[in-house]
Amino acid sequence: MPKTEFQDLDYQFSIEIVKNIPIELKNEFKTVLSVIDKELINYYYELKKDPKINYLICIEGNHIGYSSIYEDDTYWNLYEIYIKEEFRELGLGTRLFQFIKNNCQNEGKQIRSYTLPSDRRAKNFYESNMITARVLIMEDKRAKSRYKI
């Protein structure tokens, strides 16, 4: 199984494939997402398939982030990528993403990701990693939308 280790910021990091993501990380991800738009989050979870590949990133053995992927004939569909708040803006999400992307390309596949339109941070992350939007779902504006017209 692919695994990588690297030294950065005077810490030892590792990224590896695991069978299951630790529940505390999954719950933290759901909590962070829930502030965006509960209706969209529910829709997202209806679309999401069970992951086939889970990546876990650790700092000196402590879980700090993960990614879940569903593989089909053409794509590795990246449904979730999450780094704990205190470890963001350090390039760790990019390291995790690049490791996944390299493994994906080694399998002869393309990478595809799903994110919510109101998640500006995710949009910026993907664009900085050379991933661009291809599809938008448009609907009537909701009363509790984060955006003003």
Model-derived features: positions:
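Short amphipathic alpha-helix that is part of the acyltransferase structural core
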Residues: 1-42
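Active-site rim helix/loop that mediates acceptor-substrate recognition in acyltransferases
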Residues: 33-56, 68
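Conserved beta-strand in the GNAT
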Residues: 56, 62-70, 77, 82
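A conserved beta-turn-beta hairpin within the catalytic core of GNAT-like acetyltransferases
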Residues: 70-79, 88, 133-134
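Conserved acetyl-CoA binding element of GNAT-fold acetyltransferases
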Residues: 74-85, 114, 139
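Conserved acetyl-CoA-binding loop-helix of GNAT-fold acetyltransferases
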Residues: 83, 89-102, 124-128
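Conserved active-site alpha-helix within GNAT-family acetyltransferase domains
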Residues: 94, 117-136, 140, 146-147
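Conserved GNAT acetyl-CoA-binding A-motif
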Residues: 104-116
